[in-house]
Amino acid sequence: MPWLKGKGYEKEVCDYLLKNCADENGCVTLDFVVGTHAHSDHIGGFDTVIANPAITVKKAYLKPYSDDCTNLYERKRWDNDVVYGQMKAALEAKSVPIIENFEGEKTTLGNFKITFFNGNRAENARKSGENTSSVVVLLEVHGKRAVLAGDLNYRFGAEKKISAKIGRVDLLKVAHHGYARSCTAAWLKNLSPQIDVICNEKRAVHASVMHRLKKYTGAEIYTTADCNGVKAVFMPDKIEMQIDIM
């Protein structure tokens, strides 16, 4: 994922897609988009991308959001309901089908086999933040496996439950930008990745998370901001990591 800085990052995303993914007519078709959870740094600006006349989205995976299920801190400080409403409205304006419950659902993207975890809205006794509800995506191709962990955290035992279902992988997109309350020992031991990708600067990664990554995986670590973007190329015999792609 590119390191997108501040206001105007929607334009950076659109420009990147149009530069790298457009067909001979200058148009981009996305088989699907995934809204991992209703936080502005994950789905904010999605409405601008969806509304772009040169970009077509075939379907969207987006769980329902309600302030009724969200803790007071997030309701007062963040704009979860706003960014969710903007994304959903943009999808509806272009008649894009929205899949709201997709726990365990499987699909494909080119040669990739994709499985979704945490794909249904959780009903917890206590109100929680959106990170607890973050969608996790497993990708498989050429015998290689990668997990995109969104912002999943360890509340309610989510990391332990999901990683037990997934098992070992080759690459992990580290959850929650490497901040605290993610990447438990159980999660890392179950997944045992050889490559860790963190969408952040190295200096911003929480010390406890970096310690656990080194202790329990010993993997190569790539921080997207320091690398000016990271691309993982899945080949029959290896995963080739490319940097400086922006």
Feature map (PLM): residue ranges:
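Stable alpha-helical elements in mature extracytoplasmic
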Residues: Y9-V13, G26, H42-G45, N80-M87, ...
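Active-site metal-binding motif and surrounding structural segment of the metallo-beta-lactamase
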Residues: W3-L62, I162-Y179, S192-V197
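Extended active-site neighborhood of metal-dependent phosphoesterases/phosphodiesterases
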Residues: A60-F117
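Metal-dependent catalytic neighborhoods of phosphoester/phosphodiester hydrolases
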Residues: I43-I55, C69-D81, T184-L188, A207-H211
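Core dinuclear metal-dependent hydrolase active-site scaffold
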Residues: M1-T29, E92-R168, N228-M246
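Hydrophobic/aromatic beta-strand patches that form the interior of the parallel beta-sheet core
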Residues: V34, Y61, I99, T115-F117, ...
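Active-site environment of divalent metal-dependent phosphoester hydrolases
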Residues: A38-G44, S66-T70, E105-T108, N153-G157, ...
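Internal alpha/beta domain cores that form substrate/cofactor-binding pockets in large enzymes
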Residues: K160-I162, V169-L191, I195-I243
